[in-house]
Amino acid sequence: MTDILMKIQDALMNDELISKHFERKDIKFFVYPNANDIISNVIVIDEIFSPSRSDFADNNPLTYDYLFQIDVFVKQKNNNVNGSLLSRELILRVSKIMWQELGFGEFNSFKPEYNQDFNLYQASKQFRGKKYIDEGLL
């Protein structure tokens, strides 16, 4: 079995733009860091619901249905990088990777946020997709 979360992380880290702004340790699963603890950019991949069986044939499930939320946090530092623009660029790149590499389409998009107390931009989207059970993913 292959962990679908690791497959998402690998797809993100194999992208030139994402790997320029994030290290593997900056991609978290399920646990959202405290805003005060974020010192660099962070991505959080959160599974909204456990995989559910779908697309049945002869009463046997053919696919797993997934729903993930991915949040991109960009720390605005005292440099020439526009954190707001970068957070939008990164979440759009995540969306492209999720579709082209994994076949997960955008399910929902959220209002971008800025936490002034911590100079932190956040962009979030949800992605839904199916994988055939025989692909060995879980």
Model-flagged regions — what are they?
Residues 64, 69-92:
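Mid-chain, well-packed structural core segment of small domains
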Residues 50-52, 65-69, 93-101:
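Short, surface-exposed linear patches
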Residues 40-42, 67-69, 122-124:
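Broad gene-expression machinery/nucleic-acid interaction feature
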Residues 85-107, 112-118:
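Short, compact, well-ordered microdomains
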Residues 1-56, 89:
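Small/polar-rich, solvent-exposed N-terminal microdomains that initiate assembly or binding
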Residues 1-14, 50-57, 61-65, 105-138:
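Short, charged interaction patches at domain edges and termini
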